[in-house]
């Protein structure tokens, strides 16, 4: 299966009538492997900050997490594995695998729990595949 198929079929899938606003699979260096049409372009320093937070959980909490200049308040995730952010009525979930970052961005009416489920399910699958 291509990386684009993972985004189209597993991240942008319908959950209880709702979809993520955008999604992508990135390399740890920020290289885009596949993305949905509306996915924002990360700046290199944003990826650096995200990777540092995986290595040093809590690094982003004081400043927030920036994604294409949009600021997300970092909320409880899983240290070293998942970063979650909130911005207004939406948010972001980032799951780290051995080689990739699986990213989902949502807006209402999708819930944070639905976004977490979609992103983390694919991330867990990729981890089991050694990716």
UniProtKB/Swiss-Prot annotation:
Keyword list, A-Z: Actin-binding, Allergen, Cytoplasm, Cytoskeleton, Disulfide bond, Phosphoprotein
Motif position, Involved in PIP2 interaction: 81-97
Highest rank taxon of the organism: Eukaryota
Organism: Phleum pratense (Common timothy)
GO molecular function: actin monomer binding
InterPro entries linked: PFN, PFN_euk, PFN_sf, Profilin_CS
Misc. comment: The variability of the residues taking part of IgE-binding epitopes might be responsible of the difference in cross-reactivity among olive pollen cultivars, and between distantly related pollen species, leading to a variable range of allergy reactions among atopic patients.
Cellular component annotations (GO), alphabetically ordered: cell cortex; cytoskeleton
Family statement: Belongs to the profilin family.
Protein name, as recorded: Profilin-4
SUPFAM superfamilies: Profilin (actin-binding protein)
Phosphothreonine modified-residue sites: 111
Protein location: Cytoplasm, Cytoskeleton
Function summary: Binds to actin and affects the structure of the cytoskeleton. At high concentrations, profilin prevents the polymerization of actin, whereas it enhances it at low concentrations.
UniProt key word Ribonucleoprotein: no
PTM entry text: Phosphorylated by MAP kinases.
